[in-house]
Structure formats: C-alpha cells, structure tokens
C-alpha cells in the first residue's frame, strides 16, 4: 500500500508493537504514523479517528486487521473467552467501520477492507470463536456494502490462506506433518508469501475496484476450490 502511494497509519493496543512496526517501515525508507488504540473501545475509536483525520489526513482507506485467536475445544471454552475473540475480531471492525464510514459518507467516497479468513467458510478443531467471528465478518462486509454502496464506498474482504510468516516458521520445515498437509492440501503446492496479498489489497483500495462491493477475495492458493486428495494420490 505504501509503495502504491498510500499514507500509512497503524493502530495497536500494544505500544511496543507500534515501535517495532515503525522501525521495520523506517528500514525500508517508509514513514508511518502510529496511534495506540483498542478497537473494542468505541469512545477511544471515535477520539482517535478524529485525531488521525486532524493530524494526518481524512481516512480514505480503512483496513480492519486487528484480531486474536484462542485455540480451545468448544466443551472446554468459557463464554468469556468466546466473547473476547468476538469482541476483537467482529465488534472491532464494526466499531472502526462505522466510525470511519461517517467521514467517508460526507466526502462521498471510501474503501474499507475487512481481513477475513478461510475460517469465514471452513471450520477447524479448537477455533470455534475465531471461525464464528470471521464468518460474521464476511456477513458484516456484505451488510456494510448494502448500506454504504450508495455513498460510493466499497467494502470488501480478503481471506488469506496459510502464509509463510515468522509465526508459522517453526512448522514450515520438511517432515513436519502440518507442513506436508498444507503443501498437499493447497493446489498451488506451497505456502503463501506476504507479497501474494499485496496485489489484492492494492486492487481493493484503488479505483479499479469502484464497482466491486460486498465480496471476499480468498488468497489461498486454491484451498477453498477443492475437497483435497488422499495422501497416496498423485
């Protein structure tokens, strides 16, 4: 997004993560703006959005990317743990979306990108709250489009597949069962790379997507296209 000309503003509840992000971007020669923010706090969101639009620029593009996951079987999960995930992963985008959309409505344009997941479509053991939130985010994306498309605001989602990141590095090794599973389960035959998401994000943030609304683009190497195949099948 920065390479395409966007001014980057990053929010996080953890100041140390913001400092790390600022350094990472600075090492690439990119200046970013950072603000400490809890996306589940509606009053704080309203104050921070107003501050950003005063200190930086009106927000033309919003990427809802905050998220947490708790890997707990349903029978062992407490209701409060379930609510915590929904609060960040679903209520957070709702609060951020409606707060930023007010200005977009006044200006008559805007782009909102909600980071969904393959779990918007599929279930998996121990991630019931995350899957419920991401499934809800898919439908929230469609409802935002239903209400705001008339104001020339495009609201779409991106559903990443399994990506090669620092977090997945420990299991992305030859011989690891999950690594072998992902490679065989993905028609593209590999893990996604961070740069694989860039084109989709830039497209959804640009005028090229002005008539695309309420869609979730799955960047997953084809996982959702197939039931998969037995391990002994070529």
Language-model region placement:
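Residue(s) in the substrate-gating loop at a strand-loop-helix junction
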Residues: 117
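Short C-terminal tail/terminal secondary-structure segment
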Residues: 122, 202, 213-234
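Active-site helix of classical SDR
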Residues: 97, 133, 141
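Alpha-helical segment proximal to the catalytic Tyr-Lys
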Residues: 102, 146-150, 210
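Active-site loop immediately N-terminal to the catalytic Tyr-X3-Lys motif
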Residues: 72-75, 122-128, 150-151, 189, ...
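Substrate-binding pocket helix/loop in short-chain dehydrogenase/reductase
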Residues: 73-74, 81-86, 182
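Short, small/polar-rich loop/turn modules that mediate ligand/substrate recognition or access, typified
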Residues: 63, 149, 154, 212-214
């Amino acid at each position: 997004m920065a390479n395409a000309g966007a001014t980057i503003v990053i929010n996080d509840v953890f100041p140390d993560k913001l400092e790390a992000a600022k350094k990472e971007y600075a090492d690439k020669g990119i200046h970013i703006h950072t603000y400490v923010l809890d996306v589940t706090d509606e009053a704080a969101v309203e104050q921070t959005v107003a501050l950003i639009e005063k200190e930086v620029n009106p927000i033309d593009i919003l990427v809802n990317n905050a998220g947490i996951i708790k890997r707990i079987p349903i029978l062992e999960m407490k209701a409060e743990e379930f609510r915590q995930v929904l609060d960040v992963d679903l209520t957070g985008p709702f609060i951020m979306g409606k707060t930023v959309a007010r200005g977009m409505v006044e200006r008559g344009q805007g782009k909102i990108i909600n980071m969904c997941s393959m779990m918007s479509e599929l279930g998996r053991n121990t991630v019931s709250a995350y899957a419920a939130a991401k499934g809800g985010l898919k439908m929230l994306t469609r409802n935002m489009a239903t209400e705001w498309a008339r104001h020339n605001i495009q609201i779409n989602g991106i559903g990443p597949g399994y990506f090669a990141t620092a977090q997945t590095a420990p299991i992305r090794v030859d011989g690891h069962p999950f690594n072998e599973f992902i490679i065989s389960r993905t028609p593209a035959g590999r893990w996604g790379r961070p740069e694989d998401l860039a084109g989709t994000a830039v497209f959804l943030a640009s005028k090229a997507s002005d008539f695309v609304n309420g869609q979730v683009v799955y960047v997953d190497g084809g996982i959702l296209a197939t039931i998969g195949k037995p391990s002994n099948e070529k």
